[in-house]
């Protein structure tokens, strides 16, 4: 995932 994508998971 992209660095920004992990924020979406949270």
UniProtKB/Swiss-Prot annotation:
Keyword Lipid metabolism in annotation: no
This protein's record includes keyword Secreted: yes
Cited InterPro entries: Tachy_Neuro_lke_CS
Principal place of residence: secreted
PTM annotation (Methionine amide): residues: 10
Domain of life according to the entry: Eukaryota
Alphabetical UniProt keywords: Amidation, Neuropeptide, Secreted
Role this protein plays: Tachykinins are active peptides which excite neurons, evoke behavioral responses, are potent vasodilators and secretagogues, and contract (directly or indirectly) many smooth muscles.
Designated name of the protein: Ranatachykinin-C
Source organism of the structure: Aquarana catesbeiana
